[in-house]
Amino acid sequence: LALANEHGAVISAVLLGALAGSGVLPFSRESFEAEIRKAGKAVDVNMAAFAASYQRASSGGVEQFEPAVVEEPDFEVPQATSSAGAELLQKLEAFPESCREILYHGLDKCVDYQDYAYAHQYLDELRDVLALDDGREDNRLTRETGRYLALWMCFEDIPRVAQFKTRAARMGKVREEVLAESDQLFDVTEFFRPRVEEICSLLPPGLGNYVLKSSVCNKFLNLFTGGKQLRTNTVTVFLALRFLAGLRRFRRGMLGYQHEHAMIGRWLSAVRDAAGRDPELALELADCGRLVKGYGDTRARTTSQMLAILQRVEAGENIAADTVRQWRGKALADDSGEAFSEALAA
């Protein structure tokens, strides 16, 4: 990083130099330099940083880094800064100390995503899980359910993506990443790929389902789907994104919210049902929360995998904890979903 800052170059040029100078790969120095030239961006400064890094690595100036072991202090719940926050933290105190750090961050995420009522909803769901938690491994069932429940409740819909893109501190971070001077102008181009399903997720459930089933409406909405490149530093695009971000206040009445929370309810129900008869199975089902991730096609694939597991469990089959663990492992290891489908059918 110091070499990159010294030369005003991107970090990848320094990393390539260190990699080339170490000799761990069977490629010549010239082949690495050719790649930097091919990129065609700030070639001179990046080549200089590459050369400096190469020289240091090839002369034995790079040694194995042994990070110092730093003991993290025990987590303490911060002081509330508002009456609404104080009410939430008081509710958090009803949970075991081993759970509070994860649940606190979940609360923080829910408030940022929606509002304080949403954070209360998060704790209410977990209170039912805690009542069935036998306490093993420092209430691991409650902790892991809380970890993935927060992520799922804060699913990335169009308002959430727009909220991220228009945060006040974001332009400063972009300026820092591209090494732009404080008085230097730059453009920011964002890549969006909205799907018909994501547009319909903003509508009330009845209307959204109607539009999804209508071929005429689908043809019209397809005009707004596909890859889009938008300059978010322009006034019109920024204001449009701010408008979309503001739609989150109506999120509870949207099709997407209803759809996601119906699936969340099924997952939590499966976890609670298993907790009373097979705690290990309950833990594995709670860990299945990590399957649901991403946006667009990735989101559709991962949620379908979660639902496939829940359907098998809900069918009353005698599913073992190890079986669920294997299914989850296959789903996480293969983005195509083929390995998961084969394991599920076995």
Where are the regions that the model predicts?
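Short alpha-helices
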Residues: 1-35
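Active-site loops and adjacent core secondary-structure elements that bind or stabilize anionic groups
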Residues: 34, 43-346
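Metallocofactor- and cofactor-centric catalytic cores in central/energy metabolism, strongly enriched
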Residues: 38
